[in-house]
Curated annotation (Swiss-Prot):
Residues 327-446 are annotated as: Domain IV, binds dsDNA. Keywords: ATP-binding, Cytoplasm, DNA replication, DNA-binding, Lipid-binding, Nucleotide-binding. GO terms for molecular function: ATP binding; ATP hydrolysis activity; DNA replication origin binding; lipid binding. Residues 110-326 are annotated as: Domain III, AAA+ region. Signal peptide: none annotated. Residues 81-109 are annotated as: Domain II. This is Chromosomal replication initiator protein DnaA. Gene3D superfamilies: 1.10.1750.10, 1.10.8.60, 3.30.300.180, P-loop containing nucleotide triphosphate hydrolases. It comes from Bacillus cereus (strain G9842). Oligomerizes as a right-handed, spiral filament on DNA at oriC.
Amino acid sequence: MENISDLWNSALKELEKKVSKPSYETWLKSTTAHNLKKDVLTITAPNEFARDWLESHYSELISETLYDLTGAKLAIRFIIPQSQAEEDIDLPPVKRNPAQDDSAHLPQSMLNPKYTFDTFVIGSGNRFAHAASLAVAEAPAKAYNPLFIYGGVGLGKTHLMHAIGHYVIEHNPNAKVVYLSSEKFTNEFINSIRDNKAVDFRNKYRNVDVLLIDDIQFLAGKEQTQEEFFHTFNALHEESKQIVISSDRPPKEIPTLEDRLRSRFEWGLITDITPPDLETRIAILRKKAKAEGLDIPNEVMLYIANQIDSNIRELEGALIRVVAYSSLINKDINADLAAEALKDIIPNSKPKIISIYDIQKAVGDVYQVKLEDFKAKKRTKSVAFPRQIAMYLSRELTDSSLPKIGEEFGGRDHTTVIHAHEKISKLLKTDTQLQKQVEEINGILK
């Protein structure tokens, strides 16, 4: 270990020459060498924030520096102190019951310690998926089996799967919990055939209590792997073992998925996760800031939450970028600094000017109403209601006066605009379907 420390100290001296002083002081100075195993050098970072920044910005530079010093190509891995117990590859072997099946490995090694129910931020877009996941964790194979969670990238599907695993292990330490991606399942299956170890492969995945399999859409078009997973699914389900599956789309939309697999995925509960609303995005940022011990002004969180609405990973990444930028230029964090820090990833950070025409077009797209109908005298519900929504949004999203809005809707009186605004405002408080439609329109306008 002394040699490793000496090597890292030498590397730090070289790195100090290659980066700016603020960068070195902020990111590199407080790191230490943890271990060197099989051409992988593990470096300890002081906290999760620093680890993430080092991984994304300094891995290549560190590898090059170490190559110059040693002539060896070393892979770099970063850890944080609280995760060393789970990740230290030099720990002595754990004493296991001889009767216990080793094939599935230690479940803890496959679960991210950050992804628990406690760290999951609940919002309108994920509330049902969270409740279903917790129910499954509390009573595996008794609540919903399988549980199928689908949604876009970075919305929390993997977080919930890991949370289920952690909860099960915490309440039943002897439970065999296996988490893996369907890509890994496919690769291991192919290797087992090549190495004539198909029996070992089947024993590994058909003798677990909880199987958590991520990104099942990867199986699309892979007939042999689908066949194997079909039998794995049946074996586990028949033994009342819990299966949790995630995907970027519902089963019926996964192309070239065998019907028999599709039907089994639909046996239990299918739940989706949608992008977080503004309130949830702010809550996510607050939780992230608290976890990292960061003091972030509310105006900055609101700015980031308004600019990043696609997924949680990008949201947290934007926060990290703002904090890093503040540290590097040694300035306090405020909304102006946040805008400067994010200008490369939010090129149009200045608010978009929305016109009444834009609103009419967006509402027309959602409700299939022709542009000319917004100005026509038609009073059928299929036209009148979308027209009222467009008037409401024109009042909310533009600086146009009431008479101007009325003029753009066929010369209607300003009292008609007021009535439309009041009606839609009232409906939005209780009508969830309307809320979703207005949110969809807002998304188009952005």
